[in-house]
Structures are given as structure tokens and as C-alpha cells.
């Protein structure tokens, strides 16, 4: 399905933003038009669903009139003391069964069609959101929380799905029911209809006041629920730290505070909203009493039959339900429009700069690995709206093929940023980066990144087997190649001691592996990729000293004839680097070999000696 034109509404943000009842959109009409564009491909289904809804309501609304006829037959028999006409009653009962049966069938058809439409649109939205997230630049994620993105993909899409599946059907059936019942009430007796409608404005007023008073408490309820969920998630993910520092009492106190506020807000919201039904029922009963009095008087004077009074009473009983449903749907549509705004806002976000004027990417074997940073400038966004503050300023450096370049410096100096720019995770503010003399912008991101093997500080593993995780470095690798990579990374022995070996399942978050084992598996990926350029970001930060020595030897073999960028805080690990770049505040303040830098007695020597004090 072609994407409809996306507006760019600025809805409220936050992980719980998609869950607040009564949340109002900034531009209701524009959002609903955009949402309507997703409904257009299903016009035929929606038309059939509408016809089915109308027929379902028509058959169910006519039924009380037919039942009233049965009441008249019985009443006539009693009044005239004549035998009861069982044939007529039997015919009426069969007709009622047919009417209700056909009504149920059409209602089922409508429900089936609406469920299909809502699920297909939800699928389409989730697909577009997933693809959109893949195309967003990393700087977008620097200024948003994970909870916010998850809320848009899950909560907001679920809200839209629920509305399309239930609320649209309610609008159809409620509107047709109101028109049908009102028409038949007028047909039975216009004066009785006028009496019945006297209580209608009062019902609307009650519903409006209850919704108005409960809405604030519902918002508080969802806000406190978000705080409780966030606290629980925080305590669960950091339970080891909580226990280690005896933080349970403080954690319990914080939870108790949020939980009490949640309970109070929930109690108020549920109590106030719970008064709607009894109050509307009271008003309905008052109207019912008035109808009984007026109907009895009219029946006594022969102006209306007993059967019609019985049908009219049924209509009155049914009349308030679709009105309440429509009142509720108005609020639901407001929340849905707000949720849709947040979804469409994400879909309208600026994407990565598209690849243009691309050159054919050379074979990996032909890449020499010469990397040139030519007056590079770059800054991270400080928040969602502010200008970027430069971190890397006029960075210039030439990495020769096969060189081992170590990048060191204090936290925040820009070490990891350099390799992120090399992989085009971010676009430069100024200058350019060349691979073998060609601007990396002339290659597609996918091709460019295939030239780099990496072991990052965040040793990310996904749920699946050990073999699958290592194969991520080269998706078409054989089992033999995977095993060789594991041997090179010194993780093969551990894998084979496990019951399932390379088929061992890695749990969510890799909780069944130690930090060192996670690091070794990510290293095995890099061995398997065998790329011409290597990036090692704190590659041995999570392993013990003995394992580190083994890995350093293996890394030396791996880095042979490959340009390698090594980022390390432990300066003892980069003594053998060909060139060490010392960074501070985004600039290279010193460069040279380990011994040369020590002899300069500058910033590098201060860093080096501080690790041995």
C-alpha cells in the first residue's frame, strides 16, 4: 500500500504519552484525514461492513414491534375472553427468531470485516514504523528515550487498532440504532416520544460532567502508573546494586509512595466514572415512569395499543445505550487522534541523508585500508530542538594501510565518536573522510560498513544460539568457519563444555553469560567477518588479565596487514600500536608511538602514569 501523505503534528512526548485517556491532539482534522488515507484501500470492505451494520440494527430494532404484536394478540384474547390464537403467536415467535438470527449474522459479518481492516492497518503502521526506525539517523535516538519509541510502536498503534475495530463499529451501530428507534417511537406515538426525549438533555449533562471530573484523575492514574512501572523496571535491572548497597528500604519507600498515589488516583477516577451508570439509569427510570403514566392514559383512551406500549418501553430501555456509547466514542476518538499524531510524527521525522551519486564498491580484497580524516567537524545534538555543539573540531589525520592506530584520551574526548563517523552513523558538520582516497559518502552505507569488522564496548548479543550470534559477522559462514572464529577468540573451549555446544540458546539480555564471555563472542564475530579495517572499542575491557593476554596475541594475528583503530582506556593494551592519537576536547593534542609520547612528557604521560599510581 502506498504511504499516504504524512502530516507532522507535534504531539506530546514521553513513554506513557500514548496511554493517557483524554489526551487531546493538536490537529484533530489533519490527523483523522491522514488516518483516513490508510482506510481508503479498504473502501469496499468498509461499505459492506456499513451495510451489514445497518441491516443488523434494522432487523433488531424491528423485533420489538413484532413482539408488541404478540402482546396485542394475548391482550385481545384476555379482554374478549376468546381462545388464544396460537397459530399467530407461533408465526410471530418464528419471525422473531429469524429477525434476531439474521441480525446476529450481519453483526458477525460487520465484526469480521472491521477486525480484518483494523489488523491490516495496524500491521501496515507497525511495518512502516519498523522500516522508519531503520532509516532514522542515530542522533534521533540520542534525544529520545526507549520508552517513548516503544510507546509509539506498541501503545499508540494498539490504541488505533482498538478504535478501528470497536469504536468505528460502535459509531455505525449506535447512529443507526438511534435513528431507527427514534423513527419507530415517532411512528408508535409522537407525544410519547416527546415525553421520552425530555430526559435526554439531562442524560447528556450528566455524562459530560462525569467525564470532565474523572478525566484529570485518569491522567494522574496513568502518570503514577508510569512512575510505578519505571521504578519496578529500574529496580529489576539494577537489583544487584540495590542488594549490594542495602537499598531495599529506600526502594520500598519510593515504591510505596508511588503506589499509594496510584491507588488514590485510581480510586477517585473509578468512583467518579462509576457514578455515570447509576445516574443515567436513574434518569432513564424517571423517563420510564413518565412513559408508563402517559402510555397508560393513552391506552385507557384507546389511542395506543398495549403491545405498542410494550414495544415503546423496550425502545426507551434501549435508547440510552447507543447515546452513552456515542458519548464515550467521542473521548476515545480524541485519544486515538492523539495516538495517531504521535505515530505520524515519527513517520514524518527526517531520515538519514540519502545516498547519492554512488560509486561501485570495490571488492573487500582490493581495499587497502587507507583512511583520511580531512578537517572533520562534528557535534551531537544537545536535545530535540537545540543546535549541535561541536565536539570534534578540525580533526585531520592519515591512517596508512595496515597501521595500528590507538586512540586514547579522557572520557568525552571524542574517541568513540571518531569511529562512529567512520561508519557513517552520523553525518559530518564539516570536512570529509576518505577510504583509499574516495569520500565515504560516495559509497552506500551498507557497502561501506561491510569493510569494517568491529568489537564495540557494548557487547550486544541477541536471543538465539551461540552459532547464530557468531554468524552475525558473516551470514553465509559455514559451521567450520564459525568454529575457527571461536577458537581464535578463545571461546571455543567454553562453548564445547556446554550441553548443547554451539546450539546453546542465549537468553534475553545474554543473562546466562558472563561479561567476559559476551565480549569473547563479539570478538569471534570480528574474526569471522575478516574485514580489511578493524575497529576495537575497549575490546578487552570485560575479560580477565590472563584471557586478555591470549586475546592480544590473537588480535595481533587478526590485525596483521589490516588497518586497525584501537580505542582503549587501559594504556597498557596499546603499547605496540604504530601510532597513538591522544585526544582531548575533540582535538588531537599529541601523536606518536608509545615511547615517543612518554619522552614528550606531555598529556599522554600524565594519563599513563595516573593508571599506575
Give residue spans per PLM region.
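Transmembrane helix-loop-helix hairpins at lipid-water interfaces of multipass membrane proteins
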Residues: 3, 46-106, 187-191, 302-306
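Juxtamembrane loop-to-helix connectors within ABC transporter transmembrane domains
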Residues: 21-23, 30-31, 39, 71, ...
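Transmembrane helices of ABC transporter permease
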Residues: 45-58, 99, 166-220, 291-304, ...
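Helix-loop junctions and hydrophobic alpha-helical segments within the transmembrane domains
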Residues: 71, 129, 133, 242, ...
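Hydrophobic alpha-helical segments in the permease module
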Residues: 95-103, 107, 200-207, 273-287, ...
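Cytosolic ends of transmembrane helices, especially the final helix of ABC transmembrane type-1 domains
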Residues: 115, 224, 247, 271, ...
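An intracellular "coupling" helix at the cytosolic face of ABC transporter transmembrane type-1 domains
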Residues: 138-139, 157-164, 168, 172, ...
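ABC-type nucleotide-binding domain
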Residues: 362-613
Amino acid at each position: 500500500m502506498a504511504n499516504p501523505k504524512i502530516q507532522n503534528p507535534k504531539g506530546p512526548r514521553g513513554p506513557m504519552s500514548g496511554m493517557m485517556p483524554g489526551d487531546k491532539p493538536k490537529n484533530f482534522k489533519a490527523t483523522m484525514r491522514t488516518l483516513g488515507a490508510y482506510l481508503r484501500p479498504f473502501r469496499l470492505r468498509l461499505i459492506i461492513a456499513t451495510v451489514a451494520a445497518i441491516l443488523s440494527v434494522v432487523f433488531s430494532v424491528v423485533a420489538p414491534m413484532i413482539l408488541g404484536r404478540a402482546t396485542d394478540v394475548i391482550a385481545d384474547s384476555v379482554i374478549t375472553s376468546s381462545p388464544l390464537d396460537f397459530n399467530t403467536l407461533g408465526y410471530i415467535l418464528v419471525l422473531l427468531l429469524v429477525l434476531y438470527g439474521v441480525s446476529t449474522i450481519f453483526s458477525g459479518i460487520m465484526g469480521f470485516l472491521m477486525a480484518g481492516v483494523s489488523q491490516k492497518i495496524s500491521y501496515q503502521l507497525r511495518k512502516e514504523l519498523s522500516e522508519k526506525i531503520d532509516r532514522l539517523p542515530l542522533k534521533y535516538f540520542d534525544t529520545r528515550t526507549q520508552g517513548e519509541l516503544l510507546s509509539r510502536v506498541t501503545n499508540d498503534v494498539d490504541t488505533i487498532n482498538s478504535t478501528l475495530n470497536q469504536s468505528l463499529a460502535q459509531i455505525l451501530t449506535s447512529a443507526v440504532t438511534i435513528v431507527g428507534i427514534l423513527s419507530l417511537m415517532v411512528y408508535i406515538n409522537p407525544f410519547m416520544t416527546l415525553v421520552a426525549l425530555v430526559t435526554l438533555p439531562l442524560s447528556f449533562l450528566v455524562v459530560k460532567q462525569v467525564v470532565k471530573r474523572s478525566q484529570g484523575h485518569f491522567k494522574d492514574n496513568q502518570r503514577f502508573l508510569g512512575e510505578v512501572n519505571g521504578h519496578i523496571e529500574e529496580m529489576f535491572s539494577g537489583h544487584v546494586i540495590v542488594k549490594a548497597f542495602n537499598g531495599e528500604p529506600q526502594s520500598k519507600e519510593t515504591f510505596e509512595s508511588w503506589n499509594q498515589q496510584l491507588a488514590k488516583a485510581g480510586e477517585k477516577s473509578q468512583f467518579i466514572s462509576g457514578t455515570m451508570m447509576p445516574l443515567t439509569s436513574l434518569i432513564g427510570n424517571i423517563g420510564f415512569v413518565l412513559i408508563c403514566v402517559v402510555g397508560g392514559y393513552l391506552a385507557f383512551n384507546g389511542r395506543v395499543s398495549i403491545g405498542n406500549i410494550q414495544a415503546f418501553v423496550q425502545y426507551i430501555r434501549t435508547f440510552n445505550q447507543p447515546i452513552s456509547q456515542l458519548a464515550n466514542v467521542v473521548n476515545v476518538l480524541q485519544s486515538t487522534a492523539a495516538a495517531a499524531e504521535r505515530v505520524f510524527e515519527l513517520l514524518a521525522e527526517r531520515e538519514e541523508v540519502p545516498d547519492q551519486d554512488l560509486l561501485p564498491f570495490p571488492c573487500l580484497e582490493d581495499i587497502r585500508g587507507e583512511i583520511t580524516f580531512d578537517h572533520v567537524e562534528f557535534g551531537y545534538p544537545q536535545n530535540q530542538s537545540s543546535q549541535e555543539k561541536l565536539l570534534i573540531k578540525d580533526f585531520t589525520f592519515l591512517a596508512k594501510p595496515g597501521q595500528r592506530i590507538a586512540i586514547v584520551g579522557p572520557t568525552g574526548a571524542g574517541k568513540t565518536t571518531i569511529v562512529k563517523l567512520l561508519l557513517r552513523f552520523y553525518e559530518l558538520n564539516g570536512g570529509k573522510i576518505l577510504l583509499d582516497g574516495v569520500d565515504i559518502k560516495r559509497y552506500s552505507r551498507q557497502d561501506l560498513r561491510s569493510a569494517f569488522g568491529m568489537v564495540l564496548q557494548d557487547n550486544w548479543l541477541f536471543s538465539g544460539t551461540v552459532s547464530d550470534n557468531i554468524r552475525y559477522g558473516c551470514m553465509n559462514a559455514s559451521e567450520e568457519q564459525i568454529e575457527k572464529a571461536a577458537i581464535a577468540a578463545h571461546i571455543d573451549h567454553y562453548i564445547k563444555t556446554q550441553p548443547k555446544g554451539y546450539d546453546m540458546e542465549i537468553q534475553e539480555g545474554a543473562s546466562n553469560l558472563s561479561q567476559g564471555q559476551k565480549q569473547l563472542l563479539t570478538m569471534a564475530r570480528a574474526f569471522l567477518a575478516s574485514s580489511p579495517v578493524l575497529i576495537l572499542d575497549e575490546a578487552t575491557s570485560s575479560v580477565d588479565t590472563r584471557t586478555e593476554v591470549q586475546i592480544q596475541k590473537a588480535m595481533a594475528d587478526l590485525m596483521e596487514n589490516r588497518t586497525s583503530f584501537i580505542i582503549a582506556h587501559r594504556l597498557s593494551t596499546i603499547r605496540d600500536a604504530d601510532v597513538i592519537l591522544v585526544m582531548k576536547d575533540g582535538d588531537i593534542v599529541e601523536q606518536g608511538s608509545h615511547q615517543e609520547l612518554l619522552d614528550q612528557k606531555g598529556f599522554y604521560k600524565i594519563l599513563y602514569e595516573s593508571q599506575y599510581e
